Amino acid sequence: MLGDHKLTWSPIFSVIDFVTRVLSPYQFNPANYNPLRDLVEQSIDFEVLKRPDCPVKLFLSATNVRTGKVKIFSGTEISVSAVMASACLPTMFHAVEIDGEAYWDGGYMGNPALFPLIYNCKSTDIVTVHINPLFRKEVPRAAGDILNRINEISFNSSLMREMRAVSFVTKLIAQNRVVDGGLRRVLIHSIADDEFMGALSPTSKYNADWDFLISLRDQGRKCAGNWLAKNFVKLGVESSVDVDKMYL
């Protein structure tokens, strides 16, 4: 690993990158070993999250492999398997089987899925935290950079579609064209650092080095702190981003 957190010249990464291009996880990982599963089980008390009186409403999105539809896990459905399903990259891990259905990462159909927050929560504010840059100044030319940008666009596409729907409903309400009161205004906020995230190498997504993870955490806290200082007073009052300009 280089000082800039790239894994481009890492022998281990090169081997993994090659193997995942020519073999499926059912071939190179027949035992379906995923170290993340043990960490999640040790770190999260799922029984607390399942309680009806739990103050936190958690919604996990996954993609149904057979139907291509988004699946939202919530309430008593929350489990370690649901977490694994929501983070299952199909080139790295077996599809996660839950109740006879196979699931991949939710990012393909909902990244994140906003509709559960609109339908099932009372808050008028939705704060999205971006880990994939929406905008890049340069057109990618290297093969790896092109594939990375394709991945970013694909994972951002579902969010773009949902934001278009939010914008449409918001305009209807503003124009007094909603008469039955069945729709409500949603305020959108965004915490993002495209400059920092865009400067990272695509290979950094595979970097589990502790110092690198700490640097991401620290940058995230800095970005969130700056956002709160600037936009906290807008919560419950107005959107802090121009949805049409940013997402449409």
Task: Annotate each PLM feature.
Residues 1-248:
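Patatin-like phospholipase
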